[in-house]
Amino acid sequence: MLIIETLPLLRQQIRRLRMEGKRVALVPTMGNLHDGHMKLVDEAKARADVVVVSIFVNPMQFDRPEDLARYPRTLQEDCEKLNKRKVDLVFAPSVKEIYPNGTETHTYVDVPGLSTMLEGASRPGHFRGVSTIVSKLFNLVQPDIACFGEKDFQQLALIRKMVADMGFDIEIVGVPIMRAKDGLALSSRNGYLTAEQRKIAPGLYKVLSSIADKLQAGERDLDEIIAIAGQELNEKGFRADDIQIRDADTLLEVSENSKRAVILVAAWLGDARLIDNKMVELA
């Protein structure tokens, strides 16, 4: 496995792969890798000749400096996991390598609408940071496919739109959420939970599933469903942050024409902001 930290060396390797006619898959990450990331890697390996994993804690997508400062940096352990998975290339640049003149004056990519609604409304600038770094990685790696987790549902929708709008010739693959046996969605942020909070955490998925059951049973008073779900989360020990039921294809409000809904839940548990989602077919 090759570990590359600079743009010139990355370009050199990508040129070589292109000359050899290899099909390249990219898995963009911020490191602190868990089994959910490994599922992305496995999907990439199944679809391409060469797998490139990027590890970069992107300062542009953090709306709170304290979150950026405490985000775990575990490069050595991450590389050991990726080596066992037989990943071909790891791109692990420094912030200086990606943003040589800082982030304030760096050119950015913004996806109107999707970047400022829902999760974007509570985290100003977050999705602009995501679309900027992902577009830069697409330009650098020139992948045929790129794999993203469906846990970050809005992020996946945003990237799909950016790819369509910008004309990137890249297949975007959404990989289903990987869960612990108790239902908790795997996330790097789970590492912020205490042992006691970890016991409470699966309650998020239980509330999510309860909302899904109500929708599948034909209930359509969304305001009431959301209000009850918020109460349930708070009673379980969470601080409900945002609960949305949206059209899964547009992320707009559910209408009589909506065929699928997505339930998006965000809640605080101690210092960890946990997110999860679930799709529901609407009869």
Swiss-Prot record:
Listed disulfide bonds for this chain? none
Q: Where in the cell is it found?
A: Cytoplasm
**Catalytic positions?**
H37 (proton donor)
**Swiss-Prot/TrEMBL GO biological process terms:** pantothenate biosynthetic process
**So where does ATP get bound?**
30-37, 149-152, 186-189
> Which UniProt keywords are given for this protein, alphabetically ordered?
ATP-binding, Cytoplasm, Ligase, Nucleotide-binding, Pantothenate biosynthesis
Pathway the protein takes part in: Cofactor biosynthesis; (R)-pantothenate biosynthesis; (R)-pantothenate from (R)-pantoate and beta-alanine: step 1/1
State the EC number(s). 6.3.2.1
| Catalysis: reaction(s) | (R)-pantoate + beta-alanine + ATP = (R)-pantothenate + AMP + diphosphate + H(+)
| Principal location listed in the UniProt entry | cytoplasm
Q: Of which family is this protein a member?
A: Belongs to the pantothenate synthetase family.
Subunit:
Homodimer.
List the HAMAP family.
Answer: PanC
Instruction: Tell me what this protein is called.
Output: Pantothenate synthetase
- Which source organism? Escherichia coli O6:H1 (strain CFT073 / ATCC 700928 / UPEC)
